Amino acid sequence: MCPALRHFPLHCPRNRSHNYLYRRQPGRQSRAGGGKEVYWLECPQNPTQPWTKRIITNSFVNYHDQLIGDVDDDGQIEVVTHSQGSKVLVYYKIPPDPTVQPWPDAYRRTVATDLSQVEGLAMADLDANGRTEIIGGPNIFTRPINPESLWGKVTLAGSYKKTRVAVGNIYGDGRPEIVLSEGENTSARLAWFTPPLWNAHVLNSTLFHPHSLAIADFDGDGLNDIFTGEMGLGTNLNPKLFVYRNKGDGSFEQVVISQGVPTHEAKVADIDGDGRPDIVGKTCDDQTNHVDIWFNETGK
């Protein structure tokens, strides 16, 4: 069954200077943002009141991506961030008092330095050895025994620049695969990579700035599909959103689920609680400044 999604526009202004990543704490929701600072906003008892800004770090410049999860397998969540301007990938352990500003350097761990044109972050135990890896752009970073050392790096697709990254089990064998889209190219590739040699399988090589990427089961058949969406940037007059429907044998059916609405950094979640993954996106460099929801109506 092909995925069927209904577009619902939400028109609203947005703050052009920040990107936000959301994380949940017991009873409250906080969010960490990028720019010259990485910070989290503490939710008050009444969430309609102003939230308190708490700086995590101001040591680097231009934080494109953030990720929150247990990256060092100690049972605690950490904050991972990549600084394009400073070309570093680091993570922060949460100090006993997370309201201290900025978080002390003693809680920072450096994963990699001298990284160029890297975008996109994900984490997963790729080789089932019980140790989490970080996928940063087209690179896999493996954690060293010595926590003070830089992580090992394996580049799986060096020609892919400024990518979006998604990780999930596509083959159905229980092992995660990696999906990359070249989010800042006008003739961009979308490809998935299979372990252990990370062979590339290109699904499309003519996309326009596919700066949205996710893995989810959109058609409810128990197989993970791949979503990507194109930007507009004032030159692409017919941007498209695609779901690549997983046929279960290593092949995919391309399904265009939307045309004419550009999107940037769209996310996948069940918005209306019906058990189906929906899509939420917003524009980039578009003066109309709109947020859009595509409700998944597959099977309805």
Which positions does each model-derived feature cover?
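Beta-propeller-forming repeat regions
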Residues: 1-300
